[in-house]
Amino acid sequence: MPSFPVCPLMSAPLLSLALVLVPVLALPTAQAADMPTTPVENARIDDFAVGKKAIEAKNWALAASSFSKVVAKNPQNADAYNLLGYSNRWLGKYDEAFAAYNKALALDPRHKGALEYSGMGYLKVGQKAQAEAQLAKLQAICAQCEETTDLAKAIAAYKPAR
């Protein structure tokens, strides 16, 4: 059997140490994708910032693309799912919008933005009862919040399409 030269740096103890350290050093990165984020952390995410600017410019396609990238990298980011839903709602992609809102609410059932925006979406598709259900959840969380009053006003002004 042929013999191969052994690199002196790859001794058994060093190799064992490397096999232990590599997964340990990679752990914070792997865990980061599974952790929820805060507004401050979101502001540091390039695609999140691009998405927010796109929303301000009413560039819904760019916003949806940007927030899709955020949730691909951090599937626990309820804020990004909410804004992905918001962007898709403005694009008229209601199924995609509701899927994103539902994901945001699965991650954070008290997400006021997702409750409000999904309620607005339900009005857009003529499902007033579902919008009222979202309003009831908002009222239980924060009766005087802007999200609650905005959705209540939209429901009060709602007229079904003819």
Each model region followed by its residue ranges:
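Helix-start (N-cap) detector for alpha-helical repeat units in TPR-like alpha-solenoids
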Residues: 44, 78-79, 112-113, 145-146
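Canonical positions in the second alpha-helix
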Residues: 69-70, 103-104, 137-138
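Canonical tetratricopeptide repeat
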Residues: 83, 117, 151-154
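Terminal, low-structured helical/coil segments at or just beyond the last alpha-helical repeat
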Residues: 11, 15, 34-45, 132-162
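Structural marker of alpha-solenoid helical repeat scaffolds
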Residues: 73, 107, 140-141
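Alpha-helical segment of the N-proximal tetratricopeptide repeat
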Residues: 42-73
